[in-house]
């Protein structure tokens, strides 16, 4: 079988490694072009490119996969199947229709829930008790193709976007290896998705999503803190500086103070009034500083009851 693998970030590394470890010969890996990174603007390969080179797999890095020259190059490889995991570009119909087994996608949610670019973070932010991975047949819609297989992964109470990312990457790798034989021998079943998803589209995460709105319920903010760890992180402003919040908890009481007001600041944490209940900050990072527990932070930063967290630097 001629397998082509398309993927870019860390999430797509484990499935590629699993293919190699289980004896599947990958004809080529397609990933995004190298990008400049850091102060020196050094060109850095994608995580998937690095993994492919470890296994001696040829790597193609088209700027746009819909480019006719690239489509022709791919056609000449005569793939039997194309496996896609977080590639980062919309794949045109000319490629979707190319392999005899079509294109399959490893999606990090239990479809039809959480279609879109950020299903992992959104599951944590929404307080889901479980998530998982779906392998689906790709069509022209966004994550709407027929479902071939799924695996359920429960969420821990302290689950973060990062920890769930790692769990689902590994689950996706295992599910892929389990699913491929049935695709190749024709025994795989396919289940159509309903037209409507029971959850909103999980759009790409932006930095501004991390701004803590203390007029909301503290429980929603605590989930936001976990969902956006490690990137882009939840944050607020204090005295004109950004304060990232890495760990928090909910205090089951209703504050009388205005949302955003510091109620208490001691070794037990920084208590902040919210629209409902109280958010306690346990690990923070002041602009230009390292992340630290609030006890250590308070030894170097004077914060007292009545101080206010703001939604801007002003």
Task: Identify the meaning behind each predicted range.
Residues 36-78:
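N-terminal glycine-/serine-/threonine-rich beta1-alpha1-beta2 phosphate-ribose binding loop
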Residues 1-39:
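N-terminal Rossmann-like dinucleotide-binding module
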Residues 22, 32, 81-201, 206:
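Donor/substrate-binding cores of folate-linked one-carbon enzymes
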Residues 214-314:
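An anion-binding loop in the catalytic cleft
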Residues 203-216:
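Acyl-group handling in specialized metabolite and lipid biosynthesis
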Residues 25, 56-58, 102:
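Conserved beta-strand segments of alpha/beta enzyme cores
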